[in-house]
Amino acid sequence: MKFEWDPEKNRLNEVKHQIDFESARALWDDPDRIEIEAPYPLENRYVSIGRIDNKLWTAIYTIRKGSIRIISVRRSRKQEARLYEKEKVREKQ
């Protein structure tokens, strides 16, 4: 998988959410990661929820020229964590 991002957005994300996009790539290694389409008027965007070091993170990204372009990453909200756990249980049944 190829990743890309805006360097300034990466810097700001690390300051605001204490995670840089390079580290956030590990989110895609979670076998239980879930994907949700996120409506956005200018391009197709997606939400990915998964674990990095046993903590839940949420990434917003798009696909550009075959690469995953990370837009932002933050700790998952309660609603996102519930959705992740619900999907994880459902997949294992």
Model-predicted regions and their roles:
Residues 1-93:
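Ribonuclease/tRNase effector modules and their secretory precursors
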